[in-house]
């Protein structure tokens, strides 16, 4: 419900807030590296026996044989279980090495995260007018590393008796939000989804401190979820929104009241994102690209009503309402720009469109939101007899 001011005449200042820590609940109990590898070997043995094709289980990293052989380093071409691999020819990103590990990808991605909320309010008023003002700050660090959501919000709700027969007021809210666009759906792009697809024997980092991943042969096609989050930490999405209504109410005659109400909802969004290369990914390193997107949209609703309210002989009550309502929506635009192949993808100072390659992959696009309008007339009649029987017509 909307908070309103009081008629006490004394201003009332309030504060409400909390600070806490949040953590994800129970996670899936997954196999460690050796159990996962032994299970994979057992599955291959069963497949060989069922198909009666002979041979032994194999993996590019762990060789071929009755049991997997653990190499001293995983390699991009496949270590074949060798324990004498020399990593001195390390050359990122084409020739990399990483030790056999027991990585719990969930634990690497998950964290205890702070959440806080602070709100101050000021309310008061007299018979001539009331007010309720508030300001709020909310910050939630995500349980996924390098993720967050923050919001600044102010509200104003006022009403004034200008004359005995005239009243005006408003109820307006402004909010600014910012986050880094963390995916919350159930698709494979969800960070937690990657934690169950990643091979546990691959570490987060290789021997040189660069991100490790599925480019090590025989480890699947997963993307390193920690790498994805770190690379996306400077991306952000902002939204400015103003919404609320202004109203006025006038008593034309003793039993006849006119009310007008104008509501508006304006939103401006801005999207700022660098999609970086993924050198440790098995499918493709990809091209980096930087995209900026800006859009705005607003809608308004204007409602006018006449209300006749009359009581006859203390037992007959009649209320007649007539009104109009007009709506406009889709009053906005969207602009998108994108360019590829940035030389310094980690330097946010270079994240501007004209620093990218001006080739045929560039994107410059604008969209029209699709304006539409509605207008309606409505009416309602309510009659009650002795506060026992009610009849309504619309």
Where are these regions (language model features)?
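Outer-membrane beta-barrel initiation region
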Residues: 108-112, 122-126
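Transmembrane beta-strand segments that form the barrel wall of outer-membrane beta-barrel proteins
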Residues: 17, 135-141, 391-394
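A beta-strand signature from Gram-negative outer-membrane beta-barrel systems
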Residues: 1-14, 115-117, 130, 136-138
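Outer-membrane beta-barrel channels and translocator barrels
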Residues: 115, 126-127, 163, 251-253, ...
